[in-house]
């Protein structure tokens, strides 16, 4: 069981209690704080769509501390980030690994940040499947297709060549925030909120 802190606000009509994530959402902050799966993706997508309906011009802030997760769920978040009219700013707090790194890189131009001690990791998608040889082959082809898609997404957001991305993602490729900035995954490193 996870404990989610509550925040109490005083208003003219009395007190109002929010869970901390709902309170952050009022400030247009969405927090990805774990593995990416379908449930997490659906919640993040719903929050983005809600914030867009509230004000399509106002920035959305996606804070990321994630080890990555399911590629299709992550791509649903990615596609929504590109779909909404709101500019989306990304900030890595802790780690952005695998699909988390793809989402970090997908923030708006000039709006991708990392904290000083953040860790970023990119790699190729992995998966396991058992069954008949033909089914295993079908799934292997799908993983290769996903790898090409993810490499293309990273190349388009970082400015790196597809060849460099393919080479670097052959194995786990870890970066600190400075290295991620040089690589083009983030635009800047922030030490203090302004």
Swiss-Prot record:
Pfam families hit by this protein: CLP_protease
UniProt KW Protease keyword: yes
Active site: 98, 123
GO biological process: one example: protein quality control for misfolded or incompletely synthesized proteins
UniProt xrefs under NCBIfam families: clpP (TIGR00493), PRK00277.1 (NF001368), PRK12553.1 (NF009205)
Family, as annotated: Belongs to the peptidase S14 family.
Name of the protein in question: ATP-dependent Clp protease proteolytic subunit
Source organism (scientific name): Syntrophotalea carbinolica (strain DSM 2380 / NBRC 103641 / GraBd1) (Pelobacter carbinolicus)
Lineage: Bacteria, Pseudomonadati, Thermodesulfobacteriota, Desulfuromonadia, Desulfuromonadales
């Amino acid at each position: 069981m996870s404990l989610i802190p509550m925040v109490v606000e005083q208003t003219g009509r009395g007190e109002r209690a929010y869970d901390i994530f709902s309170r952050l959402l009022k400030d247009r902050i969405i927090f990805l704080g774990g593995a990416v799966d379908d449930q997490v993706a659906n919640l993040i997508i719903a929050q983005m769509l809600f914030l867009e309906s509230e004000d399509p011009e106002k920035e959305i802030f996606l804070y990321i501390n994630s080890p990555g997760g399911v590629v299709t769920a992550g791509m649903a978040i990615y596609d929504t980030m590109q779909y909404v009219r709101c500019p989306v700013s990304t900030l890595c707090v802790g780690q952005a690994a695998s699909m988390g790194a793809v989402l970090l890189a997908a923030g708006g131009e000039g709006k991708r940040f990392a904290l000083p001690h953040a860790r970023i990791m990119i790699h190729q998608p992995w998966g396991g499947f058992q069954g008949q040889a033909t089914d295993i082959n079908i799934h292997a082809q799908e993983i290769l297709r996903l790898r090409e898609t993810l490499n293309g997404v990273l190349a388009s957001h970082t400015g790196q060549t597809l060849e460099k991305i393919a080479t670097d993602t052959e194995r786990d490729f870890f970066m600190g925030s400075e290295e991620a900035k040089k690589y083009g995954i983030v635009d800047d490193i922030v030490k203090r909120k302004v």
